[in-house]
Design a protein with these regions (language model features):
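Repeat-solenoid scaffold signature
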Residues: 168-213, 266
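Bacterial N-terminal signal peptides
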Residues: 7-16
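C-terminal/domain-terminus segments
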Residues: 256-261, 268-296, 328
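Positively charged n-region of N-terminal signal peptides that target proteins for export
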Residues: 1-6
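Histidine-centered catalytic micro-motifs
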Residues: 123-124, 137, 188, 260, ...
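Flexible loop/turn segments at secondary-structure boundaries
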Residues: 86-87, 111-112, 140-143, 169-170, ...
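Sequence context of c-type cytochrome heme-c attachment sites
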Residues: 22-98, 103-180, 212-254, 289-294, ...
Length: 350
């Protein structure tokens, strides 16, 4: 970290001597992060969208290069590091480490924080006063010279729970699950999902419209362990539908983990065991949803409401095409053996 800070300061000094002012937008090729930073390359979104990998492009027919998604990502250093001092624009590390700067782009995390506060179940790290850069490193932000295809790729991220929580209490849950479950599987309270993302509205009007859903969390495999995950659904031209599942850390963490009965032999498990589960449905014109822990199992039909968005209104699609399902972020569904273990009743022990 010290070497990264030293290098960063050197860059600042060089820029100052060269009279490169932030009053003019700094070109990305003048900034050391261009070669590998996911903030700049946007590789993750493009990689999973690609039709060659069974991505959303397979039903939209629109190349990623034609989408505006890539334009939201960081094109130059000054997007994060620009600040005003004495009426002049200056380079600032303080501006870049301000949490509000991160939340300008990371809207899902901002939404999760608001939901947590509304429910009175704030994230333990947020309550403790931690901010994004207390966990996420400069290498993650600026890259290290390696071109990662996704933030989920091994080696792309430094942050993990064990960096701070090196001593784990010897509870029954930890003894049984520690080698098989990631911390997030039990300690993430919920995730917020974007459902019914309307692709045509995004392309034609440049607007992102979707129906947010929270109060649940999914389980899938990632890096050899079961972890928390999320889902997202899309509607494209011709009433084509799409569903993705991916590992996700929602920044909604509780000190107390899940109880055994929150995951084992639940109503959700029983639905899934029968081959289908209703994730969302309509009740009096209002979208309702499942809640709790939802295992991701291949071959199961996860039913969801699909709607068209026209003139500012959602209209249910009478007979939507069965959604194509994609597992992204290097996540994989639970195996049959793993799911069968979830079907066994377990009671929490003190």
């Amino acid at each position: 970290m010290k070497s990264a800070i030293t290098f960063l300061l050197t860059v600042v000094i060089v820029l100052s001597i060269s009279d490169v002012a932030f009053s003019q937008k700094t070109a990305a090729d003048q900034c050391f992060f261009k070669a590998s930073s996911l903030h700049f390359t946007v590789s993750g979104m493009e990689y999973w969208y690609d039709k060659a990998r069974g991505g959303l492009e397979s039903i939209t027919g629109v190349p990623y290069s034609d989408l505006g998604c890539k334009n939201c990502h960081i094109a130059a250093c000054d997007v994060c590091h620009k600040a005003e001092q004495d009426g002049k624009l200056v380079y600032s590390n303080e501006a870049a480490t301000n949490q509000d700067m991160c939340l300008k782009c990371h809207a899902r995390e901002a939404s999760m924080m608001k939901i947590n506060e509304k429910l009175g179940t704030p994230d333990v790290h947020h309550t403790a006063g931690l901010k994004c850069t207390d966990c996420h490193t400069a290498r993650e932000m600026h890259g290290d010279g390696t071109k990662y295809i996704s933030m989920k790729q091994e080696g792309a991220m430094d942050v993990n729970c064990e960096q701070c929580h090196d001593k784990i209490t010897k509870s029954i849950s930890h003894i049984i699950h520690r080698s098989k479950l990631d911390c997030k599987a039990c300690h993430v309270q919920q995730v917020v999902s974007c459902t019914n993302c309307h692709f045509e509205t995004m392309v034609k009007e440049g607007k992102r419209v979707a129906i947010p859903v929270s109060g649940w969390s999914f389980l899938m495999n990632y890096n050899g362990k079961v972890t928390s995950a999320n889902m997202q659904t899309f509607v494209a031209s011709g009433n084509k539908t799409f569903m993705i599942f991916a590992p996700q850390f929602s920044h909604s963490v509780s000190k107390e983990g899940k109880k055994c009965e929150d995951c084992h032999n639940t109503a959700n498990d029983k639905e899934i065991d029968n081959g289908a589960m209703n994730l969302t449905w309509l009740d009096g014109g209002e979208v309702k949803q499942a809640s709790g822990i939802i295992p991701v199992v291949d071959g199961v039909l996860y039913n969801s409401v699909f709607q068209n968005y026209e003139s500012g209104k959602w209209t249910p699609i009478a007979d939507p095409v069965k959604p194509k399902v994609q597992y992204v972020g290097f996540g994989t569904p639970l195996s049959e053996k793993q799911f069968k273990k979830l079907l066994k009743s377990q009671k929490s022990q003190k």
